[in-house]
Amino acid sequence: MAAGVATWLPFARAAAVGWLPLAQQPLPPAPEVKASRGDEVLVVNVSGRRFETWKNTLDRYPDTLLGSSEKEFFYDAESGEYFFDRDPDMFRHVLNFYRTGRLHCPRQECIQAFDEELAFYGLVPELVGDCCLEEYRDRKKENAERLAEDEEAEQAGEGPALPAGSSLRQRLWRAFENPHTSTAALVFYYVTGFFIAVSVIANVVETIPCRGTPRWPSKEQSCGDRFPTAFFCMDTACVLIFTGEYLLRLFAAPSRCRFLRSVMSLIDVVAILPYYIGLFVPKNDDVSGAFVTLRVFRVFRIFKFSRHSQGLRILGYTLKSCASELGFLLFSLTMAIIIFATVMFYAEKGTSKTNFTSIPAAFWYTIVTMTTLGYGDMVPSTIAGKIFGSICSLSGVLVIALPVPVIVSNFSRIYHQNQRADKRRAQQKVRLARIRLAKSGTTNAFLQYKQNGGLEDSGSGDGQMLCVRSRSAFEQQHHHLLHCLEKTTCHEFTDELTFSEALGAVSLGGRTSRSTSVSSQPMGPGSLFSSCCSRRVNRRAIRLANSTASVSRGSMQELDTLAGLRRSPAPQTRSSLNAKPHDSLDLNCDSRDFVAAIISIPTPPANTPDESQPSSPSGGGGSGGTPNTTLRNSSLGTPCLLPETVKISSL
């Protein structure tokens, strides 16, 4: 509407002051105030992807972002679109909800990202359709458990390394929960595990009967009564280790209240408490039963192995996650036991010498039958009792078998989650090790490079820099291109000096060409030549273009070029193939030099009578500093000039 007003308003103002008569030019049509209609098409641009829908489609849900007036904050007046910088793939499912009224959860998308999109558009997760609701809840539960495990692992010290200024409590807690962080923590881990095993074994061995003493050889007694001092010292040492571990864990715990309420803390207390109670309780007949009961609690020390066994922890997590299924199983078994015990009692009530004396006495038979154990100490004798006993056995199989797949699936899920977490941690360790190795290798290579003279200090004061004395990357690329040209064409490029790619060192090759030119002569130490590719030893035979004879490269003519001196003008011969840096380009090297190349071309056929022989230049045998390049034919023995000079542009 503002655009229409801006169109006709200047005409009206000009006519009012007499600048422009209204009759000279027709006015544009006056803007019409359009009432908002439900059949208006709205364009929604989500990260560049345009979606079109009816306005009344979005108005179905006025409590959401797209159905309320809040979407006007995202309106772009220039394009006439509602722009949202969100995921367009997710928005497709959101828009389908406005169209159909059913919200579907995409399987290929992250469940957390899907929840974030729903929260942005003002949609609640309860709107997910029944077809996707179960899968949505399972994925959300699995994701929440994984995030909780990652948070616990990070708190336990399995995450990134602690900062340098970490406190003693943090280091102790990390050592207890993740023993592989240091050698001392690993030693303490194995020591506590050893004493747990010793304590459990001693608790078992002290009940074994031993031979009598020399004074009473016929009297048998347990090993605990035969050697009380040894077992007491062993138990004392184990309890002291367990007490010290518990106190250190309590001191280092991030939240002491949470640690005291944890299951492992209760196991630790139950494992060490009977020992201290036995020290202060006198051994007499009045409290002997209570003392024996306290000694029974020592067997709970075996649960301390759960800290050292990953499988036991997985089993505990499985039972915790299957609490509802286990509760259903217990409730079903309780109902079935009560029902069948009552039926069996009244079915066997009329018989003499029956073992089903009461309904609680029949509980034992029902439990043994439903769990398919069948000890045989209690059996029905009547026909009705046998029939109901068979029904009890079959119902027990069904009741117990139904929750088992759920428990197994939860165990498998938790186990695979743990395996993936271990794999991620192992991969992270490998990546960190590779990064450290790469850094170490790079540092060593740099130091070796500097030691070999590859770098030198230039400048003084704050402007001191490292100047690379090796050849530039441009020149190395040029050498590689020369080698590729030699492989692709029939020409051979040869340099008289060797070039070391490792440190950019130039060394004399000590090789001479068959050519008699200047470039084929041995060069002194001050020469500016360097080589890229050495001359190949095996020279294959080729067939000439205008000849029927097959000759080798040994009989081919060589076109030699002169070496370009330092800061010399651009040559007009084939030596322009050599790396020639631009004069205005400041390369990171000490010197600018050119490389002389020897290009071998096939020998043309012998001169026919029609062709005219060019005259030999003066001093034809020399290869001195003449700019003209000579062509020699070993078969003719007469030097001749090349009719035209081949020019190749420099790289």
UniProtKB/Swiss-Prot annotation:
It comes from the Eukaryota. Pfam families: BTB_2, DUF3399, Ion_trans, Shal-type. The modification Phosphoserine is found at S458, S555. A motif (Selectivity filter) lies at residues 372-377. One of its GO terms (cellular component) is neuronal cell body. Residues 626-637 have a biased composition (Polar residues). A-type voltage-gated potassium channel that mediates transmembrane potassium transport in excitable membranes in the brain. Mediates A-type current I(SA) in suprachiasmatic nucleus (SCN) neurons. Exhibits a low-threshold A-type current with a hyperpolarized steady-state inactivation midpoint and the recovery process was steeply voltage-dependent, with recovery being markedly faster at more negative potentials. May regulates repetitive firing rates in the suprachiasmatic nucleus (SCN) neurons and circadian rhythms in neuronal excitability and behavior. This is A-type voltage-gated potassium channel KCND1. It comes from Mus musculus (Mouse).
